[in-house]
Each structure stands twice: as structure tokens, then as C-alpha cells.
Design a protein with these regions (language model features):
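Conserved G1/Walker A P-loop phosphate-binding module
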Residues: 1-59, 67, 110-113, 135-171
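Active-site-proximal flexible loops/turns
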Residues: 12, 30, 75, 103, ...
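Conserved Switch II/interswitch segment of TRAFAC-class P-loop GTPases
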Residues: 42-47, 57-79, 88-105, 120, ...
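Proteins enriched for Cys/Gly/acidic motifs involved in redox and nucleic-acid/cofactor modification
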Residues: 80, 128-129, 163
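Canonical P-loop GTPase G-domain recognition
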Residues: 89-92, 97-154
């Protein structure tokens, strides 16, 4: 099934502070309905996922916004990006599933319109995963030192279902 709860883990890098990461359920909401009705118009399963994503962002110090490169930029991506910007958190737009795509530069230009730094990756093939951990660590505050177990600072991963959030965590 589709997870509606947050899944939490720890990113450990030799010689660097550990940091927590929160994988949220995939957000499937109709962007038009969200714009016209707002989150209070959403009910049931989708409401649970949205609440968990909101809670993850409130607890986080940064966001990895995961999008599916094969699908291109969708209205829901634009809605979520606007919402993330309102939260004011440092954000990296992770464009997953770019392996084998032609015109990658054009695709990245499309996502560049969201206004976040971009990193193309392929969680399935391990492309740019090491760079991803470095970029995510760079989003943490400069004075961050992991002295707590689990780490006090967390990064939230948001995006649509099947964008590859969990695959990146597991890579």
C-alpha cells in the first residue's frame, strides 16, 4: 500500500555529523482543488498524508522536494513548491528518474522555474546519490553538530507518489 505515515531514519556519513531524515507519504492531491478549496477541503486518506507532510516540514530544518523527471513539471509540483517556499525552509529540488532521458537540460530548465537549486539523480541506478547526501548536508545550519541520538535536526522529503523518495533514502 501507499504509506500515509512519516518514516524516519538517520543519514550517517563518516567524518560528518549525522542528521535525521523524514520520508513522507506521496502527496496525490489535485492541485486545482487545493488552490480553490484549500487543505481544509481534503478528506480521508489524502488528508492524513497532507497532515503528516505538514508536520514533517514543521519539525525539519530543510526540505528535499522530490519530483519525477519522467513526468515533467506538473501542477501539483508547482503547488507544493509554492507551499514549501511559504514555509521558508532551505530546499533542494531533487529531480529523480533522469536516467535514460533525452533532453535532460530542457527538463531541468522546466524544474528550474520552481526557484530551488536542482540536483538530477537516479535512485534506481545510484546516479548522483553521493552528491545528494552532500547537498542535503549543505542545507543544514552552519552551526549544526549532531550531539543527540537521534539527531535533533531533520530534513523532510516531500513529493508525489512514486517520485522515488524512499528509493533515495534506501540507495
Amino acid at each position: 500500500g501507499v504509506p500515509r505515515d512519516r518514516m524516519e531514519g538517520v543519514v550517517r556519513r563518516k567524518g560528518h555529523p549525522d542528521f535525521g531524515i523524514v520520508d513522507t507519504g506521496g502527496i496525490t492531491l489535485d492541485a486545482h482543488a487545493m488552490v480553490t478549496e484549500g487543505p481544509e477541503g481534503i478528506r480521508g486518506f489524502e488528508s492524513d498524508i497532507l497532515r503528516q507532510a505538514e508536520a514533517a516540514m514543521k519539525d525539519a530544518c530543510a526540505v528535499a522536494f522530490v519530483v519525477d523527471g519522467r513526468d515533467g513539471l506538473l501542477p501539483l509540483d508547482e503547488y507544493l513548491a509554492a507551499h514549501i517556499r511559504r514555509m521558508g525552509l532551505p530546499t533542494l529540488c531533487v529531480v529523480n528518474k533522469v536516467d535514460g532521458l533525452e533532453k535532460e537540460d530542457e527538463l531541468l530548465a522546466e524544474f528550474h522555474s520552481l526557484g530551488f537549486p536542482l540536483l538530477p539523480v537516479s535512485a534506481e541506478h545510484g546516479h548522483n546519490i553521493r552528491a545528494l547526501t552532500e547537498e542535503l548536508a549543505d542545507l543544514l545550519p552552519d552551526d549544526y553538530e549532531a550531539e543527540h541520538e537521534p539527531p535533533a535536526l531533520r530534513l523532510a522529503m516531500l513529493g508525489r507518489p512514486n517520485a522515488g523518495k524512499s528509493s533515495m533514502i534506501n540507495a
